[in-house]
Amino acid sequence: MKIESVPETVPALEGKLDASGKRFAVVVSRFNSFITERLLLSACDGLIRTGAAKKDIDVVRVPGAFEVPAAARTLASTGKYDAIICIGCLLRGDTAHYDVIVNEVTRGIGQSAQETGVPHAFGVLTCDTLQQAIDRAGLKMGNKGFEAALAAVEMASLKATVGRQPSAVSKKQSLASSSVRHRNHKGARPRSSKKRR
């Protein structure tokens, strides 16, 4: 197998970490609040540091992580928000309950994002131990709430950027119509205003 040189890269669209002028909703689970409150504070800090105004951040509290997707979908469906940040903390127990909830929460958040078209950032911790959750809520492993906020800002920016880009189809149609106009103008004879008899 021959390895060839890497071809020139195609320009890529990327979102920017600029939350100014955008609205965000943060859905946070009250269950395991000693963890989720740390995630929430850090998520709001991330939004404000990237330019979001406090008045453009709405916080919605739900009983547990299982309720996060339904609330996120309700908020996304209003059309008021540029992105939704989903925050919760699930700790593995002795039964299969953890696996069921993790799967449903993950599926529900993803489905809400896909069906509404509003970016959703996943800030739900799924940990085996309490120590793992503590580490991810601001100690050894950073803060996943802050990371979710940055992801939400970038995806909201990317969505806005993509929305301003002409589609490939409209580019082709625009090129084709300008080509036709150019040919018609170039080869056309001036029409006489007099009628032939």
Q: Where are the predicted features?
A:
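Short glycine/serine/threonine-rich phosphate/pyrophosphate-binding segments
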Residues: 3-7, 36-37, 67-69, 133
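Structural motif
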Residues: 25, 58, 82-84, 118-124
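Extreme N-terminal tail/first-helix region
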Residues: 1-16
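Glycine-rich phosphate-binding loop
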Residues: 67-109
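Generic structural signal for well-ordered, non-membrane alpha-helical segments
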Residues: 17, 32, 36, 40, ...
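Short, ordered loop/turn segments at secondary-structure junctions
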Residues: 30-31, 89-90, 125-129
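C-terminal binding/interaction regions
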Residues: 2-5, 22, 98-99, 103-197
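Glycine-rich phosphate/diphosphate-binding loop of Rossmann-like nucleotide-binding domains
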Residues: 12-63
